[in-house]
Amino acid sequence: MAEKESNGVRVCVTGGAGFIGSWLVRKLLEKGYTVHATLRNTGDEAKAGLLRRLVPGAAERLRLFQADLFDAATFAPAIAGCQFVFLVATPFGLDSAGSQYKSTAEAVVDAVHAILRQCEESRTVKRVIHTASVAAASPLLEEEVPASGVGYRDFIDESCWTSLNVDYPLRSAHFDKYILSKLQSEQELLSYNNGESPAFEVVTLPLGLVAGDTVLGRAPETVESAVAPVSRSEPYFGLLRILQQLLGSLPLVHVDDVCDALVFCMERRPSVAGRFLCAAAYPTIHDVVAHYASKFPHLDILKETTEAVATVRPARDRLGELGFKYKYGMEEILDSSVACAARLGSLDASKLGLQKG
């Protein structure tokens, strides 16, 4: 969509102050769109002020709305008048305690129902685009493999759905809760496309591990995980190991490519709907460690354990078939993640041999 076509077009970004949401808000404002961004607390000046300062001179095209996942009706004012709605990922640690819901998954599914209804009632929404997670697209087989007990499909693709009935090494009850919320919310959203007369299209993008850079003042957890072999952070390195066991590889994508893909799906004409995996590279932890060891030979890089994992690649690139192109490969994602972490103080730039700033 040309910039002149974006003039007057209103889009809603839920979770606008988050890692992906803030980058997306900036990109949309730069392209000339009017953005309705939701925050859990518009009185939090650190977050609200950051969004207002993202693009100089664009403040008049940014409206901030207070909305809470556990009170889905609060999203209605932000959605009203918008032609496109971006449902950005739920915060990993969101706590349902004190709400009417038994779990985050229950709250998310209820919010999906409410938001879809609000989009219908708006009579303006043309497309809803959701940042899903590749963690809900595991190629693990339900049948046990005699040698290891764990097996994978030959490829990962959009037909893969994570089964919580399959055990795998390093499985975590905490991570299971996250998977369940992402799994159920994505399936609920996609089911809308199969209704009798849907009022708009739904697109979901199951994202790989999102890293690279941030406009926030701290390194996001996924960036911390991407640089874990360099920082030697065992907890963040543990997330890489869990993902590799779950997925048979470590899908990576740069946050800028994620937001380009989201905008691509919004601007796609005349129609786009359904599920599209979004990852630029599918390395193993061994590949990531090897890159860092080559880049920083003077450092003691945290290495992978000896457990064997099959390397599962994508069967196809459905986004690419539509015309989307990734700008960042594995090396660029990892290198920019290190630079980001060093800039924000999560890594010691002097030890890396980098200039901080």
From Swiss-Prot:
Alphabetical GO biological process terms: defense response to fungus; toxin catabolic process
Active site, per annotation: 182 (proton donor)
The UniProt record lists the keyword NADP: yes
InterPro entries in UniProt: Epimerase_deHydtase, NAD(P)-bd_dom_sf, NAD(P)_dehydrat-like
Record-listed NADP(+) binding positions: 40, 47, 68-69, 88-90, 178, 182, 207-210, 222
Keywords: NADP, Oxidoreductase, Plant defense
Job description of the protein: In tandem with Hm2, NADPH-dependent Helminthosporium carbonum (HC) toxin reductase (HCTR), which inactivates HC toxin, a cyclic tetrapeptide produced by the fungus Cochliobolus carbonum to permit infection and acting as an inhibitor of host histone deacetylases (HDACs), thus conferring resistance against C.carbonum race 1 in resistant cultivars (e.g. cv. B73 and cv. Wisconsin 22). Catalyzes the production of 8-hydroxy derivative of HC-toxin via the reduction of the 8-keto group of 2-amino-9,10-epoxy-8-oxo-decanoic acid, an amino acid of the HC-toxin.
Name listed for the protein in its UniProt record: NADPH HC-toxin reductase 1
Organism field: Zea mays (Maize)
